[in-house]
């Protein structure tokens, strides 16, 4: 099983618990979600609790993360969208921390689970719907009626807009899930090549050099992907929130 590249994604029960026929077991996925929240919160607290006039490197990282998301949200949803800053910043930090923790050997990558990424995506779209109807009432439905569309094409365009909106949770969740899943499987496969070829002695070690170089390169790429996927999720969240704030703006 250790050579199976998909074995790292198995969800195992740590504390079995069933109530009324519903499984509430505490799993390795649950453990690392708690660890992700703790790591992100702990990092931000430790780096900002004793802020100095001259920031330390870690304090600078925290402040840059804050400004990065604030600027992204301001550009994506305008000044009125800044009320969603805590939500977008929390999502970004959770996904980024989860992705980075998943790079540690023997750790579990929670963002490689479609149920986790889908829950995050549904939370985002649910927030868009709730705020959109709360703020604009039925005027929120203008989101599905683009300006300047000829009357004859309007029914078709509205149908396309509705389908596009309903597909957002799927595309948002699958993008993150698929990238993390594929990246970790690829790393596992190349690492397996290195281990297998090294077992053949000197000749095998020579043959393992290329897979080893590829593994190191892919590891560096995965760290980049870990940030990019958190960034993409945050950018799309800002774009979707803009639809809730300005439903007639497209």
UniProtKB/Swiss-Prot annotation:
Tell me, in a sentence or two, what this protein's role is: Key component of the proton channel; it plays a direct role in the translocation of protons across the membrane.
**Membrane topology for this entry?**
Multi-pass membrane protein
User: SUPFAM superfamilies from the entry?
Assistant: F1F0 ATP synthase subunit A
Cellular component annotations (GO), alphabetically ordered = plasma membrane; proton-transporting ATP synthase complex
Q: Which UniProt keywords apply?
A: ATP synthesis, Cell inner membrane, Cell membrane, CF(0), Hydrogen ion transport, Ion transport, Membrane, Transmembrane, Transmembrane helix, Transport
Q: Which PROSITE patterns match?
A: ATPASE_A
Organism (species):
Rhizobium meliloti (strain 1021) (Ensifer meliloti)
Principal localization reads membrane
Family as reported in the entry's similarity comment:
Belongs to the ATPase A chain family.
Q: Mind telling me what this protein is named?
A: ATP synthase subunit a
MF terms (GO), sorted A to Z? proton-transporting ATP synthase activity, rotational mechanism
* InterPro entries in the cross-refs: ATP_synth_F0_asu, ATP_synth_F0_asu_AS, ATP_synth_F0_asu_bact/mt, F0_ATP_A_sf
What residue intervals traverse the membrane?
Answer: 26-46, 84-104, 114-134, 143-163, 193-213, 216-236
């Amino acid at each position: 099983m250790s050579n199976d590249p998909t074995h790292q994604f198995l969800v195992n029960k740590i504390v079995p618990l069933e109530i009324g026929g519903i499984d509430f077991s505490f799993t390795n996925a649950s453990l690392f979600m708690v660890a992700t929240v703790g790591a992100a919160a702990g990092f931000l607290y430790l780096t900002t609790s004793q802020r100095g006039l001259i920031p330390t490197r870690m304090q600078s990282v925290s402040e840059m993360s804050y400004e990065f998301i604030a600027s992204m949200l301001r550009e994506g949803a305008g000044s009125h969208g800044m009320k969603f800053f805590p939500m977008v910043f929390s999502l970004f930090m959770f996904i980024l921390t989860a992705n980075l923790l998943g790079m540690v050997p023997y750790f579990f990558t929670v963002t490689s689970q479609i149920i986790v990424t889908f829950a995050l995506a549904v939370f985002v779209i649910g927030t868009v719907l709730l705020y959109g109807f709360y703020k604009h009432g039925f005027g929120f439905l203008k989101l599905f009626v683009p300006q300047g569309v000829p009357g004859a094409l309007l029914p078709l365009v509205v149908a396309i807009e509705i389908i596009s909106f309903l597909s957002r949770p799927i595309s948002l969740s699958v993008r993150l899930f698929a990238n993390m899943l594929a990246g970790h499987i690829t790393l596992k496969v190349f690492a397996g090549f290195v281990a297998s070829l090294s077992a053949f002695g000197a000749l095998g070690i020579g043959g393992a050099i290329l897979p080893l170089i590829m593994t190191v390169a892919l590891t560096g790429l995965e760290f980049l992907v870990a940030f990019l996927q958190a960034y993409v999720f945050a950018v799309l969240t800002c774009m979707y929130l803009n639809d809730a704030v300005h439903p007639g703006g497209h």
